[in-house]
Amino acid sequence: TARPLVKGDGTRSNRPMSSNEQVGTGVLRSPGARVGGLRRPDGLLENVEACGLVDPQLGVVDRIIYTDERLYQQELRRIFARSWLFLAHEDQFRNPGDFFTTWMGEDPIIVTKDRKGRIRAYLNSCRHRGARVCRADSGRTKNFTCTYHGWAFDLDGELVSVPDRDNYPDHFDPRDWGLIEVPSVQSYKGLIFGNWDSEAESLVDNLGDMAWYLDAFLDRDPDG
């Protein structure tokens, strides 16, 4: 059953866990990003000036760029959260409900085919307490069910089942607590990519001249 939280005043709350409390998703790595009514303050994200760490004339690179945690987090925000990242291949999803789990940066991702045949990608994190809703590497399913408190999500990412529903606040609306979806998912020659940026340029435009090399390699086989 869903265990209520004990607040500082001794009262109990069964509120779902917010996106910010679960994981730093790619979309939330961007300064000022919002999910629902939440907004991560810009001040929490430290920017590092990296220009002085590289001397292009001498070809010298400060070794700190390989180990500094602040630079790594900045790369997650500025690069990985706004880039097209490879997720899977279309051949892995022949039937509705086929799924594959992978990563976008440090974010666990579920890639699946919905009942209309569309490839979708979701953050693999329950909106209640942040636990994984899919622990298998791949397979086929009708719903993704969190093993912590039993919340179940369908292939469209909608919250379709909540055990002990009467224990939740009256204002709790399951329609507001579906899985966080990767907003941009596109494919090229069977290769599926995702992007946390809903306004990102198209995958084809982003590939640019690299598409020629992909064509030369993938067109050798009619199946890609």
Spans of features found by a protein language model:
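Rieske [2Fe-2S] iron-sulfur-binding subdomain
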Residues: 3, 7-118, 152-224
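Glycine-rich active-site/cofactor-binding loop and its immediate structural neighborhood
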Residues: 98-147
